[in-house]
From Swiss-Prot:
Summary of the function given for this chain in its UniProt record: Catalyzes the isomerization between 2-isopropylmalate and 3-isopropylmalate, via the formation of 2-isopropylmaleate.
Disulphide bridges: none
Pathway: Amino-acid biosynthesis; L-leucine biosynthesis; L-leucine from 3-methyl-2-oxobutanoate: step 2/4
Quaternary context: Heterodimer of LeuC and LeuD.
Record Pfam families: Aconitase
Keyword Ubl conjugation set for record: no
Family per similarity comment: Belongs to the aconitase/IPM isomerase family. LeuC type 1 subfamily.
Matches recorded under InterPro entries: 3-IsopropMal_deHydase_lsu, Acnase/IPM_dHydase_lsu_aba_1/3, Acoase/IPM_deHydtase_lsu_aba, Aconitase_4Fe-4S_BS, Aconitase_4Fe-4S_dom, IPM_dehydratase_rel_enz, IPMI_cat
Cofactor field: [4Fe-4S] cluster
Catalytic reactions of this protein: (2R,3S)-3-isopropylmalate = (2S)-2-isopropylmalate
Cofactor note: Binds 1 [4Fe-4S] cluster per subunit.
Protein name: 3-isopropylmalate dehydratase large subunit
GO biological process: L-leucine biosynthetic process
Source lineage: Bacteria, Bacillati, Bacillota, Bacilli, Bacillales
Length: 464
């Protein structure tokens, strides 16, 4: 019987197996940020250990950074975490993309753009959305702080092998529909626990047509379906993306030959299989307090089915049967490790070019990294956004989570390109609606959600 992509990635990294069936995996890349690393480094100090492979470790600052004035850090805890990471990286000789450095940015944005992320690697980070890197055919997953310490000290991690889920995507997306809508559709149909105990492998003609940055969006949110990771077999688009980047292999051709072996064999069998035809897929909007609580833009909000729905409707200030077009939007956030790359900003800019943000709407664009910001500026995207009435910010996690000054006031609604809409995620009492960059940009213009399939980008729109 053939092997799945998961099998090939896993078997290449098993050092040994213990009596309980746990495998000791070798870790090829350890990404670090300021929030989940302080206790791990302190653990090394207390046991007089060193970082085993600083050359396979890379740190950045992202969660706590103010995006309006990056040097004006007024929160005491945020400043302490940033200062601590800086000191730890210096002591343990770990490479750091510090505030102001050209390589700084959100950890799951800079990994791929610097060429640190490569097919066939095992990649971990003390962050839920490490699955992003799986878009390159890497086995990438989030870990806890105690595991961060274990990897720093040993460059290995004890893990139980997950099962493999195959998700086949068929058909061609309509204009105005994106990878973000695919993953929100998947979650709304199958729930936030469908992937528990699995690694999701996305494949099919739809994947083949996607560029790398859309594939990253898909894998980024695999964790929202409960999956250990999300992976996509590398192809020519993957190889072209990686080649020539700063940390890409120097003997590239040798690595590329090995990467071509990373695919699921034709006679391999998944433990669970799902097939989705995206041809008639519509833009999605989440209405509730987890990513599975979403509907098509042309659907009404659902009826209440249980106490969770009851609580979600109450928290969000919405009612069953309400039209998605009638949901008010006071804030728009285009950013996060899900949708802050150059192609995301280009899509949003194409929506708002020559138009104005609705009066009363606060709209932010936060590039995912310094390199994304610089590339966007070279293309003049910052002018398009600023002329439309958006705030153009510096790179960071920003409004994705309430750990920095970028927050949504209590009781107000935000159209967000991020990945989580939990209660209080964007600030106390904040009401988050997850959407694609195009949907978020259009909501900024109208002060409510509209159908980006019908949005002509010249001011005309149809709601029917």
């Amino acid at each position: 019987m053939g092997k799945r992509l998961l099998d090939k990635l896993w078997e290449r990294h098993v050092v040994t197996t213990n009596e309980n069936g746990l495998d000791l995996l070798y870790i090829d890349l350890h990404l670090v940020h300021e929030v989940t690393s302080p206790q791990a480094f302190e653990g090394l100090r207390l046991t007089n250990r060193k970082v085993r492979r600083p050359d396979l470790t890379f740190a950045t600052m992202d969660h706590n950074i103010p995006t309006k004035d990056v040097w004006n850090i007024t929160d005491r805890i945020a400043k302490q975490q940033l200062d601590t990471l800086r000191a730890n990286c210096k002591q343990f000789q770990v490479p750091l993309a510090d505030i102001g450095d050209e390589e700084q940015g959100i950890v799951h944005v800079i990994g791929p753009e610097l060429g640190l992320t490569q097919p066939g690697k095992t990649i971990v980070c003390g962050d839920s959305h490490t699955a992003t890197h799986g878009a390159f055919g890497a086995l990438a997953f989030g870990i806890g702080t105690s595991e961060v310490e274990h990897v720093l000290a040993t460059q290995t991690l004890w893990q139980r092998k997950p099962k493999a889920m195959g998700i086949e995507l068929k058909g061609k997306l309509q204009k105005g529909v994106y990878a973000k809508d695919i993953i929100l559709h998947l979650l709304s149909k199958y729930g936030v626990a469908v992937g528990t105990g699995y690694v999701m492998e996305f494949y099919g003609e739809t994947i083949g047509a996607m560029e790398m940055e859309e594939r990253m969006t898909l894998c980024n949110m695999a964790i929202e379906g409960g999956a250990k990771a999300g992976i996509i077999a590398p192809d020519e688009k993957t190889f072209v993306y990686v080649k020539g980047r700063k940390y890409a292999p120097r003997d590239y051709e040798t690595f590329e030959k090995k990467w071509f072996e990373l695919y699921t064999d034709a006679d391999a069998i998944y433990d669970l299989h799902i097939s989705i035809d995206v041809t008639d897929l519509a833009p999605y909007v989440t209405w509730g307090t987890n990513p599975s609580m979403g509907v098509r833009i042309d659907e009404k909000l659902p009826e209440k089915h249980d106490v969770n729905d009851e609580r979600a409707f109450s928290y969000m200030g919405l009612i069953p049967g309400q039209s998605t077009y009638d949901i008010p939007v006071q804030h728009v956030f285009i950013g996060s490790c899900t949708n802050s790359r150059l192609s995301d900003l280009e899509i949003a800019a194409s929506v708002v070019k020559g138009r104005k943000v609705k009066e009363g709407v606060r709209a932010l664009v936060v590039p995912g990294s310094k390199r994304v910001r610089d590339a966007a500026i070279q293309k003049g995207l910052h002018h398009i956004f600023e002329e439309a009435g958006f705030e153009w910010r510096e790179p960071g996690c920003s409004m994705c989570l309430g750990m920095n000054p970028d927050q949504v006031p209590e009781g107000e609604h935000c159209a967000s390109t991020s990945n989580r809409n939990f209660e209080g995620r964007q600030g106390k009492g904040a009401r988050t609606h997850l959407v694609s960059p195009a949907m978020a940009a259009a909501a900024a213009l109208y002060g409510h959600f509209v159908d980006t399939r019908k949005e002509s980008y010249d001011g005309a729109i149809s709601y029917s």
